[in-house]
Each structure stands twice: as C-alpha cells, then as structure tokens.
C-alpha cells in the first residue's frame, strides 16, 4: 500500500494512535531473561528494532526465538530485564502495545467457516475498528494479497499460498506499527514463497517495520537489512547480512562431493583457508580459488561446486551442523 492510501480510503490510520518517534526503537529488550525451572531459555538478551527495518531473528530449533516472541508480546513474563514495544512497557501494558502490532503466526489460524473477506472483517473487529474503517481498508488488503477475485471464496477452498497471503493481509488490518512474522513461508512451494517475498518487499518499500523469524537463510538474506543470531537464549552475532558474511566467512566456498574425500581433504587443505567435512560433503573455504579448482579438475569420481559464501555458511559456522530437535 502507498502512503497516500491512508487518506484515500485504502488504509486509514486509527484516530487515537500516538506515533512512535522515528528515531527511537520500536522494540527494545534489555538484559531480558526467562527460565522454566532450572532451564534458562532466554539469557540476558539485548535487542533493538528500529522503525523501517526488516529485522531477522535467527537461530536453530530450541534457540529461544519463540519464547522471545512470546516475551515481547507480553504472553509470558520475564524473570529479569526490561522490554518496551511501541513505546509501551511490557508486560504491564502489553494489551495496549498489541493493538499496534500485526502478527503472522507460523501456522495459519484463519477461520475455515468464513470467506476471505469475512476473515478480514472479523479480525478488524478484534481491534475495535469501526465497520466504516474496515470497509475502507479491505479492498486494499485484498489487492495486496492478490485475492480480489477470491473475496467471497471459503478459506478451505484456498491454496496454501493464498491462505498465507490472506494471513499476512489480515495482520495488516489494524495498520500496525510493527509486523511480526514467524516462519512466514514454511511449507510453501517456491512460486508461493517468491510471491510472499514480493509482497513483503512492497511493505518494506512503504516503510513498514518487520520482525521476521525464519529457517530459510535465503529468505533472511533477501529480505532483512539487519540480523540477530541467537543460540541457547544468547545473542551470538548481529549485523547486516553481507557484513556478517564478510566478517564470519570472508571468502568463496567450494563444495566437493565424491569418493575418498578424507584422502582428498589432505591434499586440498593447504590450498584453503580451512576445510570442513559434513556428511558426504567436503567444504573448502578459499580466498584464491584457482589453485584448489585446478587441483580438483580431472579428479575421477569427484564433483564440486564453486560459489560465493552466503548466510547459510554463517549460520552453520555460528550454530554448528548438528541436528537440533
């Protein structure tokens, strides 16, 4: 939606809303701690999300991402530290803060007994919006979700990608200061995923602030302009995606597949900054790839892929390659 849609009937701001100052953090956690029994799940966590950012919160399973989201929404109480959301202290004024937030949960919770347009209307009432305001916003949201021609369709008849787009549109019904998205494209095929990315980029272009959790590193690299990686409830790295790639990896990657990789690794190690075995793949990190590629050329029973380093390399370096439950 364009900014002028707020005044031409597409997207009308709630009259009682107080603006969040542009130069302050829209979300801030300071030394936040949460534990269940003896298990610490969020450990002195500091975060700041500023207006206009697409902020990625990354971490393996069990890192504390879901608990962090619950804490910032006031759905669970911290054991220590302080939180503010949209200028409100959390959890003391969590209900007021949540009125200025849109949430896209990991799993769709649309009402299957209602149509697309009815899902939008009902959700608008949860925020106390008048029927007039809701009716002004719905057409723009249907257009945003590319569901103009499915407004009266039942949710049960929509594809997975359509349901996900409707969930995002529904989270925008209150014109939120912050949009929180938990694994927004999990379970979608590539075409549906790319369409969601396109819609999110249009939100970012309009200045919307987004907090995103995802296990798709390509998604984080494409969408986010700032990232925080957590593990064990602690922040272990933060920065812009390409800055993290440069500082943590800083070179090209050659993936090698084939026979007798342990033997081959010995001859390739002197040609690389470092090497790493993971399953049936040898990873070689190289600043000058030509000598290593020359050594691989003509090797029988060996395949290889030379590529730039990416955010997945960073994530695996920081959190390890072991499977997490």
From Swiss-Prot:
Chief location of this protein?
A: membrane
Name the enzyme's class.
translocase
Report membrane topology. Answer: Peripheral membrane protein
Q: Return any one Pfam family short name.
A: ABC_tran
What are the binding positions for ATP in this chain? 59-66
Its annotated compartments are:
Cell inner membrane
Molecular function (GO) terms for this protein are: ATP binding; ATP hydrolysis activity; transmembrane transporter activity
Q: In what residue span(s) does the ABC transporter domain sit?
A: 27-257
Q: Do you know which InterPro entries this protein is assigned to?
A: AAA+_ATPase, ABC_transporter-like_ATP-bd, ABC_transporter-like_CS, ABC_transporter_ATP-binding, ABC_transptNodI, P-loop_NTPase
Q: EC number(s) of the enzyme?
A: 7.6.2.-
Q: Looking at the UniProt record for this protein, which Gene Ontology cellular component terms does it annotate, in alphabetical order?
A: plasma membrane
Keywords assigned: ATP-binding, Cell inner membrane, Cell membrane, Membrane, Nodulation, Nucleotide-binding, Translocase, Transport
Tell me where on the tree of life, at the top rank, the source sits.
Bacteria
PANTHER family for this protein? ABC TRANSPORTER ATP-BINDING PROTEIN (PTHR42711), ABC TRANSPORTER ATP-BINDING PROTEIN NATA (PTHR42711:SF5)
Q: Which family does it belong to?
A: Belongs to the ABC transporter superfamily. Lipooligosaccharide exporter (TC 3.A.1.102) family.
Listed under subunit, the entry gives: The complex is composed of two ATP-binding proteins (NodI) and two transmembrane proteins (NodJ).
Q: What does this protein do?
A: Part of the ABC transporter complex NodIJ involved in the export of the nodulation factors (Nod factors), the bacterial signal molecules that induce symbiosis and subsequent nodulation induction. Nod factors are LCO (lipo-chitin oligosaccharide), a modified beta-1,4-linked N-acetylglucosamine oligosaccharide. This subunit is responsible for energy coupling to the transport system.
Please give the NCBIfam families that the UniProt record associates with this protein.
nodI (TIGR01288), PRK13537.1 (NF010060)
Designated name of the protein: Nod factor export ATP-binding protein I
Q: What is the lineage of its organism?
A: Bacteria, Pseudomonadati, Pseudomonadota, Betaproteobacteria, Burkholderiales
Q: Give the gene that encodes this protein.
A: nodI
